[in-house]
Amino acid sequence: MIQMRIAVCDDNTVMLSRLKGIIYNAFSVYTDEFEILTYSSGALLLNAHKQEAFQIIFLDIDMPKVSGFDVAKTLRDDFSNCFIIFITSHSELVYESMDFQPFHFIQKNCEISIEENMSRIVKKLMKHMKQYEKVILEDKESGRHAVYIHDIMYIESEKHYLNYYITGRNAPIKERGSIKECEEKYERYDFVKIHKRYLINL
C-alpha cells in the first residue's frame, strides 16, 4: 500500500498537537502506512502541498490571513482531488463548506467527543479510499486493463472464467479464474457473494 500523506492545519498550536495525536490513533487501527504533518497556517500548508501533494487534509476553517475556506478554494481551483475534512467551532459554517466538496465536517465543541467523531470519519474514509484503488485485469482477447475498484459493478463466474462488469463498458472483461479466488481477492473491498456464481460490489 502506498504511504498516505496526511496534513493537519490549525492556527492554535495546542489544538494542532492534540489533533495530530487523535488522527494518529484513528488511522493506526487500519494501517501504519501513513505520515502526519502539521501546519499552523494555510499558507504553509499550501506551500507544502505544492511540493508534494497530500491525500488527506484536516483543515481548521477559522484562521487569520488565509482561512480554511481560502485554502480549500485554492486546492479545488488547482484540481486537487485530496480529501478535505473541515474542523471548526462554528457549526453554522457547515453549509458554506459544501462549496468545497469536503469529505466530512468535525465540530470542536460538539457533544460527541472529537476522538469518537474522528474514529467514525476515518473508518468511513478508509472504506471510501479502498474503492479508489486499481486492479489489473487480464482479458484473454483485449489484453490488460487497469480498473478502479469502484467501477466494478459485479463479477460473474462462467466455467473457468470471470466476467467483470464495469461501469461505462458494454462488454465484460473476461479473466481466467475461479469465484473462490475472486472472493479472497476482493474480500477487503466489501464485495458480497449473493449466489455461487456472483459477487457484487457494495
Spell out what each predicted region is.
Residues 2-23, 57:
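Conserved acidic segment of CheY-like receiver
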Residues 13, 40-44:
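Acidic phosphotransfer microenvironment of two-component signaling modules
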Residues 27-40:
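Short hydrophobic/Thr-rich beta-strand motif most characteristic of the beta2 strand and flanking loop
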Residues 44-129:
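CheY-like receiver
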Residues 119-202:
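Conserved binding/recognition cores within well-folded domains
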